[in-house]
Amino acid sequence: MMVFQSFILGNLVSLCMKIINSVVVVGLYYGFLTTFSIGPSYLFLLRARVMDEGEEGTEKKVSATTGFIAGQLMMFISIYYAPLHLALGRPHTITVLALPYLLFHFFWNNHKHFFDYGSTTRNEMRNLRIQCVFLNNLIFQLFNHFILPSSMLARLVNIYMFRCNNKMLFVTSSFVGWLIGHILFMKWVGLVLVWIQQNNSIRSNVLIRSNKYKFLVSELRNSMARIFSILLFITCVYYLGRIPSPIFTKKLKGTSETGGTKQDQEVSTEEAPFPSLFSEEREDLDKIDEMEEIRVNGKDKINKDDEFHVRTYYNYKTVSENLDGNKENSNLEFFKIKKKEDHFLWFEKPFVTLVFDYKRWNRPNRYIKNEKIQNTVRNEMSQYFFYTCQSDGKERISFTYPPTLSTFFEMIQKNIPSFTREKTPSDQVSTYWRLINEEKKENLKKEFLNRIEALDKEWSVENILEKTTRFCHNETKKEYLPKIYDPFLHGVSRGRIKKLPQFQIITETYIKKNIEGSWINKIHGILMKMNSNKFEQTIEKFNIESLSIEKKLSFFSESQEEKINSEEEIKIFKFLFDVVITDSNDQTLIKNFMDFHEINKKVPRWSYKLISELEELEGENEENVTMEPGIRSRKAKRVVVFTDTEPHNEVYTKLKDLKDNQNSDQNDEMALIRYSHQSDFRRELIKGSMRSQRRKTVIWQFFQAKVHSPLFFDRIDKLFYFSFDIWGLKKEILRNFMWKNKKNQKIDKKDEEQSKIEEKRRIEISETWDSFLFAQIIRGYLLVTQSILRKYIILPLLIIIKNSVRMLLFQFPEWSEDLKDWKREMHVKCTYNGVQLSETEFPKNWLTDGIQIKILFPFYLKPWHKSKFQSFQKARLKKIKDKGEQNDFCFLTVWGMETELPFGSAQKKPSFFEPISKQLTKRIKKFKTKSFLVLRIFKERATIFLKVAKEIKNWFLKNFLFIKGKIKDLSKRNLISLFGPREIYELNETQKDSIMSNQMIHELSVQNKSMEWTNSSLSENKIKNLINRIKTISNQIEEISKEKQNLTNSCNKLRYDSKKMESSKKIWQTFKRKNTRLIRKSIFFVKFCIEQLSIAIFLGIINIPRITTQLFFESTKTILDKYIYKTEENGEKINNKKTTIYFISTIKNLISNSNKKKISYNLCSLSQAYVFYKISQIKVSHVSKFSKLKAVLEYNRCITSFFLKNQIKDFFQEQGIFHYKLKDKTLLNSEVNHWKNWLRSNYQYNLPQIAWARLGTQKWKKKINQDYLVLNPSLTNEDSYEKKKFDNYQKKSFFEADSLLNPKHNLKKDSIYNLFCYKSINSTEKIFDMSIGIARDNCLVSCFLEKYNIRGIGEIRHRKYLDWRILNFWVTKKVNSEPWVDTKNKKKYINTKVQNYQRIDKITKTGLANKKRNFFDWMGMNEEILNHRRKNFEFFFFPEFFLFSSTYKMKPWVIPIKLLLLNFNENINVNKKITGKKKGFIPSNEKKSLRFFNLNKEEKESAGQVELESDKEKKINPESALSNHEKNIEENYEESTIKKRKNKKQYKSNTEAELDLFLTRYSRFQLRWNSFFNQKILNNVKVYCLLVRLKNPNEIAISSIERGEMSLDILMIEKNFTFAKLMKKGILIIEPVRLSVQNDGQRIIYRTIGISLVHKNKHKINKRYKKKSYIEKKTIEKSITKYQNKTVNRKKNHYDFFVPENILSPKRRREFRILICFNLKKKNARDRNSRFNKNIQNLTTVLDTKKDLAKDKNNLIKFKSFLWPNFRLEDLACMNRYWFNTTNGNHFSMIRIHMYTRFPIH
């Protein structure tokens, strides 16, 4: 039951998978997707649904829907039907269909009655409107869609069509899917429209809110057709923007620019039948068929109306050099063949080719030349071409099939109808293929066995070598083809072409003479269509003349051709050619012969040396300036800022004679490129190319250097390439925390927004002026006329009028003051961008490029000059103070107005009459104040008197009434005895209230009584009753008063307690109020506390590193001063006890700690002299002074005499440490080169020295050396020796052979001293390397010389590409001299260094590990010598976590795993170069050791003398030497700057040249500076341009500084202001983006070997080596001589296996491996889709095979571990060519492999 359930479940899953992967479901899915590609056809469909109503409207809806569906059906049919697909898939189809139909439809909509025939029939098919609706929906459905591009869907459809078998089912199902989606979409649109119609509230509220808009809405409804036509027009214009017009496109000239190489050029006007972008399989790809105009025999050019078929022949001559050194180019000789009868190209081509061929001449089938790509198409480019071929014995589609082969096959099929291929069944093909491969495999096995047998029996070399196959054309006689013509041979045997033969000029006499022996290729006769009646094919014998022609037409020289018998020649040419002999008078044969002389496929390619418009503006490519730019750059203009015509320095005159052939008339121009402030839609497109090729690109920034497709946004690592400044961010965060002011922020935001709006408006105005034709000319003339009118007409006229009016008013005129101000006004001509030139000089091309006129010190007419600051000036100064700037200038507008900025809003001029009116108002005010002063005083006093009288009166009345009321109250109450005793108490609030209420009652009673008495009309009974009532009330009052009196006595006693309760109540109430307030404000209080705490903590964290580094350095400095440097002064106080040298004790601690971690520090960084100098400074007794040193030196006697200097030997002999004359013995080198021995142990890497030199060339070694990681380039850690070649110093604890530092050895003081002295002596090993014979890099000398070092190179690179922000290119001086240095030795070292300078580069370094040093600085003592502090403190504190992690990120293949957390130091020696007679100073930043380039012996000696003299000067007076050297540098620098005038491509210094080379060749970059700096720099540039042209620039300079126009902090005071300084200050930020750089082949090979090598840290090598033979057999030992001296380890490992396949040749070895990979066993051929087969093996047999595989698993692993390097080296280089027909692995795309699954082997 369970089995049945699982079976059912498996069937369900398989059924679901089949349904999902079925053709119908996929077609429905793709069809449903195409519904969402909404295009212009939907506009017509919606218009028919929305607009048309009534009976005609329904018919229009039906016709629109029918046309819509029919158009989509045609699109789907075009997928299956190739001709329709070709017709509709071309871009020009849209042009041809859209333009006339668009015009027709547009005019028809605008003129409604244009096609109204007024037919009364009911047959609506005759109505033209319904037909047009049908056509609209049909035609526009065929166009490309624009909202969701249909090209993406078309690609998906094409991919599935490529893989699908049942294509028609897929097309129908996709159409059904589209139909379903379309019906659903239209139903949804209909429901939305119905809902809008039914919902009246939407129509009333949304559309018509008031009566104002009812008219507009009605008009909108009436003009709906017009709106739809406008939308249609916009969409069609959008299409035409992407589509090139077939008529108005730019025709490209076919000028060939290949750098002077000779080419086979052929002119043809016919289009290539199979245009392709890929290169033909030729040796030289510079030989290209191109379309160009040709000069015939040095005459005039061919007319455009006349076209010729021209065949070019070269007259190759030997190149002869003239006296001038120029070479004569080879002359081309041409002759006419045929003149075309048609005059126009357009009528020659068929209409289909003209309209529908999208691969026509205006398509950019070419590459743009740059430094990396020199040719049109790269050599050896892989060719992706789909065609059927046999793979695994079956017909497969290969995407790397040679296109030339397929083209040739198609041509044969067309011309030879009998040529048909019988389709053999797959079973037969597979068996045939299997048999062939089995035969090949057996042959290889036989060859393999024969080779082993030959080695075993010691046969001769002839029997071992591989046999070659020859082409035999006669088996009986065993006659073979000559080696030159044998296709099975290759290499030298086929011959070499040294130079092409010299063709004679082919004339008519030459053709008539040799016409009888003309040969025509048989293959040409098959392929080319020609009239067979024109000549008769006959085969005759060859005569002598024909053989002579063969020699002339041969491509091989006579010396290289092998001698062939006449019989063999006849047989060969019978096999290849038919001889055609015709009448010599018939000229048709000659023409036909010349027409089809060769098979060639014309691929349209054009010139690739195109220059962009930007390069034309810059004028850098002087050679190509005459060319018309072929690449459209961003819209820009070249603005010449400054033209240097005169020399400005003395150095120019001094070094004038150094300039060779300098043109004095040539002027240096400094120009700027002004870009237009608009989006760049050109995007480096080639002129005439199709914009539709790049329509998927999206500009998502205002200005974008690289345009990406939205499909690849996920591939971009960073959308924005910017530098992340952490410290700047911290400062900004702190500033925002500490200085928050919302009001100021709001005001600043408003100001910024306003300024942005104004800036945008200005840019728009400038761009509009620049965009219109002739607008700049009109504007320029208007500005010049306004300037002349203002300066010479309007302002003088105003001055005259003003002064004449002053004279009429009897005032003094102000002629002098006004004329002075008028003369001060300057009208400076500026460029369109605002760069100032001068008053008289107009900018270059100012009529076309534009002009600005800047008015400096503008003249304002004043009524008088002696007045104070006027109001407008005060307001203006106030504004200027707020802004922090003063702008005493303005720009002139076209209308004569003034603006602060070009194209800005007009400024309000100060009024002439405003100060006059203000003065008049002031005087009127003064008169008014004087005349009405008395009246004001009287009025004020009268009002005061009346107020006082009123107040007195009111006060008197109030007091009188109050006294009267009090008297009445006293009279009413009982008199209280004033003199009797009484208790005074305080009443509480309740008592007071009761008393007040009693008083009120009492008063009421009294009033009632008086009223009763006065009323005499009342009866007496009532009076009596009232009297009784009053009595009772009075009695009650008395009783109540008595009771209250008792209560008051008791209350008086408890007064204190009641007060206390009252106060406690008040406190509680206040506490409650405070508590609620606290609860409400507690959140803000907590936030405030957290902010304060976070600020404090953050500031503390920031200051921790600074404090710790400061404390640490202070402590180390004090320790050093205390324990080391005061030893000389306090030497007398040192006891005679056992002394400890502090820096050696620290070494002891460090080594003991490092021994636990298996790390030992390298002490080689100390120089020998320094060690002995420090030891000699210790003042102790003679016995203990050198006891430890003596033991060490006696232990290593072989070292002392060989290594120590003579002075130290003499000193040691005097002290009695060791004998002077000791025998020289070879030192046991404890640091054996294990890596080299390991390489020798593996025989396949035991290469000779020549092979190693080929493996890594000098260029490659230089590249490797340049990639070194430098930690500290200063002299503190530079080494005083150089290692051997291929010698790597490693940590001692990793090897058992190095027994000096054993982990079990106790590190005592004696061993420390021994180690110290041994390392110091052993550090330099040998002064001279015996293998090379030159002195090593004497870094000791560099410690005492003045060194010019490049700062910043030692900083760690955090990226895998070069970051120029790290490098600092300025030079720092270091004078390093000590009194204990011997000058004699110094001079000797200098001499040797200069002599061997040019040979130092021969010392090769194998890799990064060669320069590993422990980063141990001897507690900074070397730094004390140089007085130089460390730059980066983080290196000193956390080297384990910082340095090597970043190094491992950049080069993970270099650093071993065990060394990842260790320190090493690597130094690059940058030696200075003092030029003697050589021109120019070159401060290098990348060379490891500089040489004297191209110097002869005299110059070398002079250079050495210069260096020695400079050293002497430094010894005597270091400051003067430094100053002299500075002058030296300045002179050389000036000399190099003058060289720039000769050629613009020369740079100021080598640093700039290298930087420019880096930026142009290896990086695409963007330069930008900070926004706050931008305007300041531009303002400075503008002022500089004006000051340069003025004779007396002082006044303008001072005024510009006062105005704030020129900022002094940006002035370039330094001469050498390099890029590094700009980058450090944040002005310029260069951010290179990584590019794909083509790796060096030698480097790839070396890295491939390096992967297979086991690192020697993991590969332990024993102390002693044992030599073993490679194989035990004696016979093989003799034959394999190169494996005899192989050293192996004592322990047997898996790397010693013998590889049998290496006996085979490399070619057979590769073939053998590939044949092994194929499964060539017998197999039953069955259908691929059949899942069940009856012949199923049992389970036991399968398990047995698995067991067999498991047995050989270990052996297989061992075998593969040794085979892997061989596979890597050979297969990677040859696999692509062998399998995929690709000749270069770099261009092979792995994506294309992943697109197609592997084919299963059945």
Curated annotation (Swiss-Prot):
Keywords recorded for this protein, A-Z: Chloroplast, Membrane, Plastid, Plastid inner membrane, Protein transport, Transmembrane, Transmembrane helix, Transport
Coiled-coil annotated residue ranges, if any: none
Protein name: Protein TIC 214
Organism: Nasturtium officinale (Watercress)
UniProt family annotation: Belongs to the TIC214 family.
Compartments, record wording: Plastid, Chloroplast inner membrane
Name of encoding gene: TIC214
Membrane topology field: Multi-pass membrane protein
GO cellular component, one term: chloroplast inner membrane
Lineage: Eukaryota, Viridiplantae, Streptophyta, Embryophyta, Tracheophyta
InterPro entries for this protein: TIC214 (IPR008896)
Transmembrane segments: 19-39, 68-88, 91-111, 133-153, 176-196, 227-247
Any single biological process term in GO: protein transport
Its job: Involved in protein precursor import into chloroplasts. May be part of an intermediate translocation complex acting as a protein-conducting channel at the inner envelope.
Subunit structure: Part of the Tic complex.
Note: There is a partial copy of the N-terminus (positions 1-343) of ycf1 in the inverted repeat (BAF50686).
Cited Pfam families: Ycf1
